[in-house]
């Protein structure tokens, strides 16, 4: 029994050390650190919950990974495809906008107020590393990827996720704002407007 007790205690300590969750009102902040060999994976997630309308959640995700000191220095100082991809992809930033509806949605435009002239790309949501290197401001994915399903209506709630990948350059710009004001425009020309406190500074993301 003692061995089982101490085993469970160690598991609890491990989880507390690697998992941090902070919740206040309609906001959830979550940080997870995982280690695999010499690689450390770090995910920080900020979730803003909306009470009204079809837009239910705004989720901001910062993803990073750290190699061993020697491998890190090698990639930071070397040239070529892999070192360039390593530098371009660390850290990674993205917004996930989650909608509930009785149909599949597509979004043709995402506008950050104050940056209406931002350069927007529309690659597939799973961006290969070579496209990461060319990412200008942000990527909203292919708005017509599920076009053949747009006319269908379902007798249940469909969870739609719009993923917007942010470049490091654009992240530095929006981090300076006092408030995040974002307009999402669906393929049916319906607008979803967001106006919230800029959490990027508050949580040091």
Curated annotation (Swiss-Prot):
Cellular component terms per the entry's GO annotation: cell outer membrane
Function comment: Virulence-associated protein essential for survival of the bacterium within the tick host and therefore within the natural life cycle of the Lyme disease spirochete.
NCBIfam families named among the record's database cross-references: VirAssocBptA
Keyword annotations from UniProtKB, A to Z: Cell outer membrane, Membrane, Plasmid, Signal, Virulence
One Pfam family here: BPTA
Family: Belongs to the BptA family.
Signal peptide: 1-23
Protein name: Protein BptA
Source organism superkingdom: Bacteria
Gene: bptA
Species per Swiss-Prot/TrEMBL record: Borrelia garinii subsp. bavariensis (strain ATCC BAA-2496 / DSM 23469 / PBi) (Borreliella bavariensis)
Membrane as UniProt keyword: yes
Location(s), subcellular: Cell outer membrane
Family matches, as InterPro entries: BptA (IPR031471)
Location (main, coarse): membrane
